[in-house]
Amino acid sequence: MATLESRLVDMLTVPVEALGFQLWGIEYVQAGKHSILRVFIDGENGINIEDCANVSRQVSAVLDVEDPISTEYTLEVSSPGVDRPLFTAEQYAAYVGEDVKLQLTMPVAGSRNLKGAITQVDGQMLSLNVNGKELVVALDNIRKGNIIAKF
């Protein structure tokens, strides 16, 4: 059975792309009785507040018709930002050489939280240099991954 996030990606990719943007990813966070659905979009020329508002209206209309979430939730549409979350193998591969912060489902090398540089992405496996040590992490073991912004 597909996860809610993967069903939402399938449902929302075409409407977001029809507006000229890329659906970067989706996070669904349950917070008690009220949940948050975060939709991250990206574009060739970046994203502004008007872009987010337009996508929000379109996504909201699709969600009202499809009704994939049975509980009350807040819809948030935004750019991924400088510390952008990473969702797919392609996104991780695009950031080889960059530092990332990972939260894992199962520990790797005794830790569920890793920080290091992406050295390689091979299929569904991510290689990470953590303090000079090469670690391999299955992408399906990553609960959350973000770029570490450099200022």
UniProtKB/Swiss-Prot annotation:
Pfam families: DUF150_C (PF17384), RimP_N (PF02576). It is found in: Cytoplasm. One of its GO terms (cellular component) is cytosol. One of its GO terms (biological process) is ribosomal small subunit assembly. It comes from the Bacteria. SUPFAM superfamilies: YhbC-like, C-terminal domain, YhbC-like, N-terminal domain. Gene3D superfamilies: Ribosome maturation factor RimP, C-terminal domain (2.30.30.180), RimP-like superfamily, N-terminal (3.30.300.70). The keyword Cytoplasm applies. Its main location: cytoplasm. Keywords: Cytoplasm, Ribosome biogenesis. NCBIfam families: PRK00092.1-1. Belongs to the RimP family. Required for maturation of 30S ribosomal subunits. This is Ribosome maturation factor RimP. The lineage of its organism: Bacteria, Pseudomonadati, Pseudomonadota, Gammaproteobacteria, Alteromonadales.
